[in-house]
Amino acid sequence: MKEDYRAALKKTLCTWLGTTRLSLELTQDRMAEILLIDVRSYADIDRGISMCSTLTFVLFLVYLCPEPVTLLKEIRARFDIIRNGME
């Protein structure tokens, strides 16, 4: 069950990070710098290979995310689907 939530979160964040980076016309290097992580770590998150840390997620919400509330609602909707499927 926990892995289902993690997979949904990873997929959502991968999409949002990539879309945001492209819309802001930032390189992976610049995104990594803003998020205080190395470029390889960012690239792995961007490709959906790795999950970001809590700090990285909060830095993204605070400094880069164009619609933080929308992102959180999307995560909640995905979590609700998982939760409802298990009841």
Put a short name on every predicted segment.
Residues 1-23:
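A short, Lys/Arg-rich alpha-helix, primarily the initiator
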Residues 18, 29, 58:
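Residues within the helices of the helix-turn-helix
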Residues 22, 33, 62:
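Alpha-helical residues within the helix-turn-helix
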Residues 25-44:
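Short alpha-helical DNA-recognition segment
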Residues 53-71:
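DNA major-groove recognition helix of helix-turn-helix/homeodomain DNA-binding modules
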Residues 69-87:
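Short, charged recognition helix plus adjacent turn
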